[in-house]
C-alpha cells in the first residue's frame, strides 16, 4: 500500500514537471539539514528536558523570519508559516524532539555529548527535515 502511494505521488510529480524542482530543492537544502541534524544529535535531551533543543529550533526559525511561539513551562515551540494566498486550509507539521535514555557508542564525529541520552529514534532527523 505504501509503495503504491509513493508511486502515485511520484507519477504526479513527474506529470506536473515538479520532480526536477523537488530534486533541486533537496540538493539546495541538504547541507543545512545535515548541519541541523548533527547539532541536534550531539545535544540530545530526554523528554521534557529539551531546553537547548527548543532554543536551537527557535533560533533557526527566527533566522528564517518565521514567527515562533514558546511556552515558559514546556519545551518545544510552535512556528506559524502563512501561505502566499492568504487564508485557506491549515496544514500541521510536527516533529518529536526528545532523545532516548541510551548511552551512544556509535563513534561518529557528531555523537551525543549527553551522558545516557542519544537520538537512536530519528527525532533529530525529523526535526532537521522539518526545519
Language model feature labels by segment:
Residues 20-119:
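Acidic/His- and Gly-rich active-site-bordering loop/insert found
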Residues 11-14, 44, 101, 130:
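Enrichment for repetitive, rod-forming helical segments
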Residues 3-19:
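Short, Lys/Arg-enriched N-terminal segments with co-localized hydrophobic residues
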Residues 113-131:
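Alpha-helical metal-binding/catalytic segments enriched in His/Glu/Asp
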Amino acid at each position: 500500500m505504501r509503495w503504491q502511494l509513493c508511486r502515485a505521488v511520484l507519477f504526479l510529480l513527474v506529470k506536473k514537471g515538479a520532480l526536477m524542482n523537488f530534486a533541486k530543492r533537496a540538493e539546495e537544502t541538504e547541507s543545512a539539514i545535515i548541519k541541523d541534524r548533527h547539532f541536534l544529535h550531539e545535544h540530545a535531551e530526554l523528554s521534557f528536558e529539551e531546553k537547548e533543543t527548543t532554543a536551537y529550533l527557535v533560533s533557526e526559525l527566527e533566522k528564517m523570519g518565521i514567527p515562533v511561539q514558546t511556552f515558559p513551562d514546556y519545551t518545544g515551540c510552535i512556528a506559524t508559516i502563512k501561505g502566499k494566498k492568504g487564508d485557506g486550509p491549515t496544514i500541521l507539521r510536527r516533529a518529536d524532539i526528545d532523545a532516548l535514555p541510551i548511552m551512544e557508542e556509535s563513534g561518529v564525529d557528531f555523537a551525543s555529548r549527553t551522558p545516557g541520552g542519544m537520538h537512536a529514534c530519528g527525532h533529530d532527523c525529523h526535526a532537521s527535515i522539518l526545519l
